[in-house]
Amino acid sequence: MKNKISQFVILFVFISGSIFAQEKTIFQKNGVAINGYDPVAYFTDNMPVKGKETLSFDWKDAKWQFSSDTNLALFKANPEKYAPQYGGFCAYGVSENHKSPTDPSAWTIVDEKLYLNYSPKVKELWTKDIPSRIKKANDYWVLIKDSKE
């Protein structure tokens, strides 16, 4: 009986550790998505705009910051419309089957979706064949979204 309890405890610890070890599906630093940039501003202002700590919203275990009350309201009403693809990880990196951090100034909007890249140089690689990269990234994201960075 003691042996079965020990086996159960070991199994429980292993499973719990696996569950809690999973990384978040949103790229964030100190719990803040997009390095504190306003995701809506990419669409409305056509440029990255730093959000304010006082205008924030928790979504998918990350804090999203906004530059205006209007942008905050737009995001709350439809976060999937404004949140970057692949959880804000580098779109090019995901198309290469790995997660990479992003630079908020390296971005594109394609078919009303926001894509971020690791750097302006990586964005250049991304823009050489965006349709193919999106297809690859969509396929890989399903497999890697819950993996460690």
Regions found by a protein language model. Give the residues of each.
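Bacterial Sec-dependent N-terminal signal peptides
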Residues: M1-K24
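Charged, low-complexity intrinsically disordered segments
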Residues: Q22-E149
